[in-house]
Amino acid sequence: MIFISIIGLLLSNAVTLRQDMSVNFNRIALIDLIYCILHDTMSLSIINKGIGLHGGLLHITNITLIFHIFIFFLSILILQLTSFYPRKAWIPEHSSLKDIIYQKFLNYRTKIFNKMGEHMKIIEYPLILLFVISGAVFLMSTNDLVSIFLSIELQSYGLYLLSTIYRNSELSTAGGLIYFLLGGLSSCFILLGTSLLYINSGTTSLDGLYILNSISDVKDGAADMPALTSWYKSYYLNFALLVFSIGFLFKVSAAPFHFWSPDVYDAIPTIVTTFVAIIAKISIFIFLLELVYHTNNYLSEFSWTYLLLISSLFSLIIGTVVGLTQFRIKRLLAYSTISHVGFILLALSGCSIESTQAFIFYLIQYSISNLNVFIIIITIGFSLYGYITTNKEYKDLLDKNNSPIQVISQLKGYFYINPLLSLSLAITIFSFVGIPPLVGFFAKQMVLSAALDNGYIFLTLIAILTSVIGAVYYLNIIKKIFFYLPDHSINPSIGEFLFKKGLIFEAGDFKGRITLISSPFSITISIITLVILLFIFMNKEWLSMGTILVQVLFSN
């Protein structure tokens, strides 16, 4: 169905240049993704332990199907940011036709209603998103080295295009170029690892690699079997997998391969950052889960998964320490992501039932929480279009149309402008910190408990310390929002215009109720925030799903 929509959007883009049709194209993509969710949900009951497709190039399991649905769901939430207008006008009851016309004219004159940035005018946007989603879905289900590279490149090239699709933005173009060049470097590592795997195994099938790895693993524990120990060395595949995994760690911005992500996140528009920071990582982590499960060497002295532990250590330290010095909000979120990637890698490297369950749960909850933060930041930017600021530093910011909120100090005193939105952001940030009873606390508890069970005592201590230190830059955001007076004030020209036209009773009465956040934005933020806040009352459903997925994986 995704391919049918891609073909339809390609044909539509070829015959029309109307930029106002972009919203309709986005809604078509939304309908397509909803259909994909329904189709995959119906397929869950017949998959059982897995189905091979196209001669073994793809392998569909219940875990991959669940995360297909999860990616489709998150993509719908991201795509609705450009499928519905972010603001709606408030018009007094019993208004005359004349007053309504004046109100509409006011909204367009002050650019409150139609100041959407370029993201509402690019008709190629949903098309590229569907290409990225296709690559992510294929990557999670791939079972061959060739299809792995094709899938990761399909996903990556779509993200490069998304990063540079805002042609009038110099920052966006520069960020997309950095992403493209360094993403190409990571692809070189993947290709090098692929060639080493093929040279050492003679096959491109992952099933063949898993069999060879099992044989070499048994050989390392079979000192009394010289016939088995003479023909193959386990470090052949382990070294190849080590090089192979470096490329994927680069793409998920795990330290020490993280240096591209803060610059790229900060440069590209916030809506694109939402997609790059979330969807691109989920597919790679699920692929790495399958790879770690089938190639972890229990009897060998050296395993490529040691790289995951080293990367986890660096990610926890660098993401926390360097994040303390950040004052730009998207750079701060980039380092926050690096720190959370450290927790995910710590759970991934354990390869036990408990650690895999912690990995799945942490990945799901962090993706949802991270999405909520980005949606709230985008919504705050939309809500401040009717305000002006006295701070001259904000006037020097570049690309304010596509990234209205760029520095943390822009959130100063926002609680006095929109208390409910501020509380939603605070709850999500407290979940990042790991404060009980929010969902982030239970996720970190599961990861640390699984790490202790696997004997990673030092890494567990580092994770606890970095969580405490990382709370400093999270609480700095809370302090700016709640404990400072706002720098923003109502645009006086709006109040004067309203007063002259008789739309309100006194000048300066323009408030947030005049331009409300649209219903899709409000509903999305409200539901995600309630899930984060009330997880303690519905934890059985989440944990049961993770347990079932782990049992399916370990029963294969």
From Swiss-Prot:
Alphabetized HAMAP family for the sequence = NDH1_NuoN_1 (MF_00445)
Give the main localization category.
Answer: mitochondrion
- Native organism is Podospora anserina (strain S / ATCC MYA-4624 / DSM 980 / FGSC 10383)
Q: Which GO terms describe its cellular component?
A: mitochondrial inner membrane
Q: Where in the cell is it found?
A: Mitochondrion inner membrane
The domain of life is Eukaryota
Membrane topology term: Multi-pass membrane protein
Residue ranges spanning the membrane: these are 58-78, 122-142, 145-165, 177-197, 239-259, 268-288, 304-324, 333-353, 358-378, 423-443, 455-475, 517-537
This protein is called NADH-ubiquinone oxidoreductase chain 2
What function does the entry list? Core subunit of the mitochondrial membrane respiratory chain NADH dehydrogenase (Complex I) that is believed to belong to the minimal assembly required for catalysis. Complex I functions in the transfer of electrons from NADH to the respiratory chain. The immediate electron acceptor for the enzyme is believed to be ubiquinone.
Q: What class of enzyme is it?
A: translocase
Q: Which reaction does this chain catalyze?
A: a ubiquinone + NADH + 5 H(+)(in) = a ubiquinol + NAD(+) + 4 H(+)(out)
State the family it belongs to: Belongs to the complex I subunit 2 family.
Q: Which gene encodes it?
A: ND2
GO MF terms here are: NADH dehydrogenase (ubiquinone) activity
Query: Any one Gene Ontology biological process term?
Result: ATP synthesis coupled electron transport
Q: Which keywords does the record carry?
A: Electron transport, Membrane, Mitochondrion, Mitochondrion inner membrane, NAD, Respiratory chain, Translocase, Transmembrane, Transmembrane helix, Transport, Ubiquinone
One Pfam entry name: Proton_antipo_M
> EC annotation?
7.1.1.2
Where is the secretion signal located? Answer: none
